[in-house]
Amino acid sequence: MTLESLRRDIDRIDARILSLLDERLEKGLLTRRHKSGSLDSGREAEVLGRVSARSRCLADEAFTTGLYRRIMDESKAIQDRRLSLIGFQGMHGAYGEAAARAWAPEAATMPFGEFSQVFDAVLAGDVDYGIVPVENTLGGVVGQVNSILVTTELRVAGAVDMAVSHCLLAPPGADHRELRTVYSHGQALSQCRRFIERNGLEGVDWFDTAGAARMIAEERPKGAAAIASRFAAELYGLEIIKDGIQDSPNNRTRFFVLAKEARQATNGPADGDHGRAGDHGRAGDHGKAGDKCSAVFFADDKAGALFAVLEVFAEAGINLTRIESVPTEPGDYAIFIDFAGSDRDEAVIKALDRAG
């Protein structure tokens, strides 16, 4: 045991404390939806009593109870701000969270383990919005998300198209020449394969890019790094050894922002009969060149069903950029389409009415 090793241990503990503090404040923010106000004196007394009973000899009781009073005061202050809440899949620092912050910088972001949990949280009113990836230029459509989109009653309130730039991250001061192992999600590892092989690194599959970054920040395994976003590096205090290490520069992900109701800036979902269709252009870009709309139609599994939908858009002179059919149940299909245009264009409105 040396001074250096003890300080490394302290750094790891500090990182965990900060992560747990953030998690506690998030849970407090979620409770705001289930009570009439931020102040609950009975609950506060219960928490302080439990803290007092569990105080250990190294931590004075007055210190621990005072600390928790400050934490609860901060929690109440955050709740009183009545922030919009956006749920995303993954851990803090995930690309989904970066997309959420790009769409609504003032909102609070809430992590969920599964895509389905994001949908459920919006439906339950626990969060105002959910953001999910629907398509990646390298990996194609996100099948799990599209399968849920077919059946959900949520509306798409907006979209974010984001460049995905992978970074090699390590603890500050780490010697990059000593790096031997790199942790990340399997998809990120595959997208950076040439860089990994060229530098003689061993890729280790992790459940999440942001999770890998957090592990490196908290555990600091010797000779190890993570592949994650610049956002994750800033969040976990990691050093960016190398930016843009993905094999292909054309790596972009499109995200949908989900809500119970479409935002006022939009005209509602493209398939108004079902209340669950596409994105109506990037938020704030309606009616401008470069708008991109998405819609989903439901059709029987019979000859000519797909052609009937596509013919409408061809006759209207609307350029389709994506066509995909997904089976929903025996004999039925959902047809996903993306097309250039705005949901405020007269030609688009008429085409959607005819196709729907």
Predicted feature residues:
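Domain-level signature for soluble enzymes in the chorismate/prephenate branch of the shikimate pathway
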Residues: 1-356
